[in-house]
Regions:
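Short beta->alpha connector loops
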Residues: 2-3, 25-26, 51-53, 108-109, ...
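Glycine-rich phosphate-binding loop at the start of an alpha helix
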Residues: 6, 29, 158
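A general structural signal for well-ordered alpha-helical segments in protein cores
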Residues: 57, 88-89, 158-162
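Rossmann-like dinucleotide-binding domain that binds NAD(P)(H)
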Residues: 70-132
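NAD(P)-dinucleotide binding in Rossmann-like oxidoreductases
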Residues: 105-170
Length: 170
């Protein structure tokens, strides 16, 4: 839980130990400022979502030519945006790269809906709520569309940790 990470990580990061921090990194701007300061001071930490490493998504990260230019992505997730929204964001970041220009939240606390626009023109929706099934991406492009589900969570978690260990060694 993000609101506990500053105090839990403080002794390790201030002692110079590298850390992997589970999602979400923070839940407040104040805590984010603390992590930014630690980063700027040379602390080594990594946080990510295992959804970025779903093997079902990987072929599309390398090339999605059969879909053409991505125009719309919908990535429904279960639970609350504050704790699980990062899964949707991380799974689409390798598809779109940097350049998100606007975020609009509609819906309610129980059933959130995030509308995001990327500078490349792709619109993104992330519907979330308790009891809602998720862990997939609907991609609609100029030439086709596809819905892909992440089914092998073991692979995703293992790859995430393997890459963290590689990061530690380099």
């Amino acid at each position: 839980v993000g609101h506990e990470h500053v105090e839990r990580c403080r002794p390790f990061l201030e002692a110079g130990l590298p850390m992997f921090i589970d999602k979400p990194l923070v839940n407040s701007e104040e805590d984010l400022r603390t992590f930014v300061k630690w980063h700027d001071d040379g602390a080594q930490f990594l946080t990510s979502s295992s959804m970025r490493y779903c093997k079902e998504y990987e072929p599309y990260y390398a090339n999605h030519y059969e879909l053409g230019e991505l125009m719309y992505i919908c990535s429904p997730m279960s639970k609350k945006y504050e704790t699980y929204g990062i899964h949707a964001l991380e799974s689409m970041y390798p598809l779109l790269g940097p350049g998100f220009v606007s975020v609009q939240s509609t819906g309610t606390y129980e059933r959130s809906m995030m509308h995001i626009l990327h500078e490349g023109g792709c619109a993104v929706d992330i519907p979330q709520g308790i009891g809602m099934a998720g862990a997939g991406i609907l991609m609609i492009g100029s030439k086709g569309s596809n819905y892909i589900q992440c089914r092998d969570s073991y692979y995703a978690f293992k790859k995430q940790l393997d890459l963290f260990v590689h990061w530690l060694r380099t």
